[in-house]
A protein has these predicted regions:
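Expand to "…catalyze enediolate/carbanion chemistry for C-C bond making/breaking, isomerization
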Residues: 1-302
Length: 302
């Protein structure tokens, strides 16, 4: 990602499955799943007395068959916890695609991890994701995202954690997440201003497919790039909702073709199928077509 301008990641992040690192069987199953990314969780889903066992599970898993065409993210415990240092040593040893920091409250939380990765000569490809799941995290979302433009920060993505946010604020679960929308949109505005991606929070009732569909559609309409998932049954719907449909792809290709026509040279606004289209729409169209190509390549590589 270019740090001097808000250029977004080119990775697919429609479906981001969280898997407890303590569950060795679930780890193995991720290889065959169609999710775009996997979060290997060492934090909330692992009891304190089993943290060391979970780290050993991840060591064994990473030494085996690689996860092809999936981002691998390790969610660590807070660095100021008794587990944080051991988790970071594991991250440095395994070199996943990203480390996910829990309860990020301020820019310094990101920069301290960035400095630690730099001091350890971790590869630049090892990125940072931030859980935004506290009142301070929401209030400081823009400042945290801006830290992503600091040279060497490695910040790529925000993940919203509504379970913790509800607990800390007292906000009750509600269809449509009416009272949470301002907070969610604050996250979207922050990442868009500074070229990051945003992943929506988990939906806890994985058996309620209709409600999950509705929440995915809601998140996509707000501008989220994907959804954090707790069960493989949610992958297909997330991929569908956060991926472009055929009509959108066709429209984007028409916009690209229209601006490529020599007659459009030097024009900032043109007519495409009866609509006035600006060059800013060309950028959006190119991004959408690129995303569609990445999805097609994933399907071919299966």
């Amino acid at each position: 990602m270019t740090r001097n301008s808000p250029t977004r990641s080119l990775n697919l992040r429609r479906s981001v499955l969280s898997v407890p690192a303590i569950n060795a069987r679930a780890l193995e199953k991720t290889c065959a799943l169609d999710c775009d990314a996997v979060i290997f969780d060492l934090e909330d889903s692992v009891a304190p007395e089993r943290k060391a066992e979970a780290r050993e599970n991840l060591k064994a898993f990473f030494s085996g068959a690689p996860l092809l065409n999936k981002e691998r993210i390790i969610r660590i415990n807070a660095l100021d916890s008794i587990f944080g240092n051991a988790d970071m040593e594991l991250v440095l040893a395994l070199e996943p695609d990203a480390v996910l920091l829990p309860k990020v409250d301020e820019p310094q939380d990101v920069m301290s991890i960035s400095d630690r990765l730099a001091d350890a000569d971790a590869p630049e490809s090892l990125r940072i994701w931030a859980m935004i799941e506290t009142p301070r995290g929401i209030l400081n979302a823009a400042a945290i995202a801006e830290a992503g433009r600091t040279p060497g920060s490695r910040l790529d993505c925000f993940v919203v954690g509504l379970n913790d946010l509800r607990k800390e604020t007292g906000a009750l679960p509600q269809p449509g997440r009416t009272y949470l929308v301002p907070w969610l949109m604050q996250v979207v505005l922050a990442v868009r201003a500074y070229g990051l991606d945003a992943i929506d929070s988990v939906f806890n009732d994985f058996k309620d497919a209709d409600a999950f569909d509705a929440e995915c559609a809601h998140a996509r309409a707000m501008g989220f790039d994907g959804k954090m998932l707790i069960h493989p049954a949610q992958i297909e719907a997330a991929n569908l909702h956060f991926g472009p449909d055929e009509a959108a792809i066709a429209e984007a290709e028409a916009i690209i073709a229209a601006f490529a026509d020599p007659a459009a040279e030097g024009l900032n606004v043109i007519n495409v199928n009866g609509r006035m289209i600006e060059r800013l729409h060309l950028v959006q169209a190119e991004s959408l077509v690129h995303k569609a190509r990445l999805i097609a390549e994933r399907q071919t590589a299966k």
